[in-house]
Each structure stands twice: as C-alpha cells, then as structure tokens.
Swiss-Prot record:
It is an enzyme of class 5 (isomerase). Its EC number is 5.6.2.2. This is DNA gyrase subunit B. A type II topoisomerase that negatively supercoils closed circular double-stranded (ds) DNA in an ATP-dependent manner to modulate DNA topology and maintain chromosomes in an underwound state. Negative supercoiling favors strand separation, and DNA replication, transcription, recombination and repair, all of which involve strand separation. Also able to catalyze the interconversion of other topological isomers of dsDNA rings, including catenanes and knotted rings. Type II topoisomerases break and join 2 DNA strands simultaneously in an ATP-dependent manner. One of its GO terms (biological process) is DNA topological change. GO terms for molecular function: ATP binding; DNA binding; DNA topoisomerase type II (double strand cut, ATP-hydrolyzing) activity. Gene3D superfamilies: 3.40.50.670, Histidine kinase-like ATPase, C-terminal domain. Keywords: ATP-binding, Cytoplasm, DNA-binding, Isomerase, Nucleotide-binding, Topoisomerase. It comes from Acinetobacter sp. (strain SEIP 12.81). One of its GO terms (cellular component) is cytoplasm. Belongs to the type II topoisomerase GyrB family. Heterotetramer, composed of two GyrA and two GyrB chains. In the heterotetramer, GyrA contains the active site tyrosine that forms a transient covalent intermediate with DNA, while GyrB binds cofactors and catalyzes ATP hydrolysis. It catalyses: ATP-dependent breakage, passage and rejoining of double-stranded DNA. SUPFAM superfamilies: ATPase domain of HSP90 chaperone/DNA topoisomerase II/histidine kinase, Type II DNA topoisomerase.
Amino acid sequence: SHKVSGGLHGVGVSVVNALSSKLELTVQRAGQIHEQEYQHGVPQYPLRVVGQTERTGTKVRFWPSAETFSQTIFNVDILARRLRELSFLNAGVRIVLCDERINLEHVFDYEGGLSEKSALDIAGLPGKLADCQEKDPALSELFLVEGDSAGGSAKQGRNRKMQAILPLKGKILNVERARFDRMISSAEVGTLITALGCGIGREEYNPDKLRYHKIV
C-alpha cells in the first residue's frame, strides 16, 4: 500500500495532499484501523486508531483545492480510460470507478493483464481467444462467435494455422450509440479491443497493429 499510495517516486500522496483543500487517510494494518485528516496539507490531529479489522489496505479521499485549480470537477471519461489501462497493466487488480453524481459504477478486472503469448489470456472476462499460429496479420482471420458452446464447435472445425476464434457472451453493446465510459466498461468490448490489438481513441488507435486483416 505504501508503494501504491506513495506514487512512482514515493511522493504521490504528498503532492495530492498539498494540492487538496481536504484529504482523509484511512489505513488498515496489523489488525487496526488508523485515520488522519488534513486541510490544505496540514494535519488536523495525530494519526489515531478508530477500530479493529482483519483486512489490510489504504484508502485516500481528497478534495482538489479551488485555490489551485480552476476546474475541480472530475471527467469520468478520462478517469475510466486511465483506469482501464491500469487494469490491463496490473494483472489480478480489481479497480472500481464510482460516479456518485449519476449513480454509475464501472468495474475493471482483467486477471490476465496483457500478454504476448500465442494464445492471448483473457482470464476473468466472458470468452477466451483461441489464437492462430500465423503471425502475419494479412494471413490471419478472426471469427467472432456467440457463447462458449458455439466457440467450442468453431474451435474444433477451424484451421489452427490461420483462423482464430473469439467467443463473446450474449449480444455485444452497440458502441456507435453508447457513451464512451459505458463502452470501455463492457467486458465484451474490452475482450474484443484486446484481441484486435490496435487500440482505441485518437491517441491509442494504430491500424498497423491490427492482429487480423479478416474479421468475420
């Protein structure tokens, strides 16, 4: 928890504290719950024990200072995109984004993270990619099928050299009409984005990285 809260160089939470009008810190450690509150970087009381627990972890809650920032309203689309990236890069970490303003919750939980293996591991998501042996995207084909049962049949009848199978659970979200944050929180869409490999968005999308030139 110290590494995560401290940031890359151990100063992450210190900087956030200095730029916040208020910060609440709760630490669950060694069977006890500790808490401390800061206002504009100044502790309001010493670290104190407020209860007992069997859990471990750190919770940081902060309010950006209006004296420092001209805009203190969070953009949920930016947060969702960043948290989705982190969930891919940190295998086994479950990230939950709650927007209490409109009562929405997004869960990012990609147990396999990113992998360069032949069979792309997408554990924790509905559907698994059965990759092909061919490494040339121009010669590779991806077949999208509905459900694991259809996926099993397709895997048995495919040409393993050039045909990959990706089972998707149920009817996939219509991304043309969906909000961006809802789109990237969809497990099926996340699975598809990972399998295709070309990324999404203006900054990340790169058609040259597309892993299959034929998608059915």
